[in-house]
Amino acid sequence: ATFSPTPKPSPTPTPPDLVDSYAVQGAEVASHQSDTMHWRIERIEQEGAVCYLTKIYLLDPGTQIRKATANWERDIQYPVDMAAKIPDATLFINGSGYVSPTFPEIPSNYPGSSPDYYYTPLGSVTVTDGQLFRCLTGVPYYGLSLTRDGLHMHVGDDPADVLAANPTQTWSFYIECPVIRDHQSILDPNWRFTTAPAMRTIISCIDEHNFILLTVTRDGSSALTMRQCVDYLQSAFDPLWTYNLDGGPSIALYYRLSPDDDWVRVAGGTSKDADIMAFAD
């Protein structure tokens, strides 16, 4: 009898790193590349606003995207202080918007009153390092979740469905903050930030391994409205989805070329936040 050797399984192809392939190129601020990660921060001017584009490739986003937080219900912290909790990160941005005596608004469908939520993120689900801090049953979730298979955006999902995927982290803000879904704008034309120029931190997912961060500053003659940001991201990158993280004085963009280096501030970082999103090798 003739026996054919069992064919070896094909190796899983390495997903493409798109950092160098986008048509839009700004002036390089810094870049970092390793076997598992590639990012480059670029300075651009868009409609009079000085902005930073951070192009990111991650081999395994489910483990390389990280979160650090302030103390639940007790305080908010400077982003660079929270980053000290993630020693292997080389890049971070600010994360969730939060409730405080200064920003006390909570949605009308949240149980309780604003002081019940002080110094915690907006959003009906909060998970940090796999630990559940909040689940408002029946209150739709508008935010991000990180699971073993990567980063996901939720647009009004049931908290039970979000938690069923066993997220390790969440980040969230206003219900209007998912602004692009399935390559289409879902920006609410009546949201006050749609037409108000502001400093912003926005994350776009190109595919499961490639992301674009847009950091909008007030260093130029103007900031950008959310409509300007969405139009720009769609025309330049056509993202799968886009989510608006905390903005205004809360923006932060920092990098370091190795975990042994001190953090370098690119933008923001001067106000305290509830949490950060970091990227590690």
Regions found by a protein language model. Give the residues of each.
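Short, solvent-exposed aromatic-acidic interface loops
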Residues: 69-74, 157-162, 215-221
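Extracellular mucin-like PTS domains
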Residues: 2-14
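Zymogen propeptides
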Residues: 11-137, 143
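Active-site-adjacent helix-turn-beta-strand microarchitecture at beta-sheet edges
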Residues: 101-192
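Conserved, well-ordered active-site substructure
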Residues: 103-136, 188-243, 250-281
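Active-site neighborhood of phospho(di)ester-bond hydrolases with catalytic His/Asp-centered motifs
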Residues: 92-95, 242-246
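Beta-strand-turn-beta hairpins that frame and shape the catalytic cleft
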Residues: 46-51, 149-150, 205-212
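A short, polar/proline- and glycine-enriched secondary-structure boundary/capping micro-motif
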Residues: 75-77, 162-169, 222-230
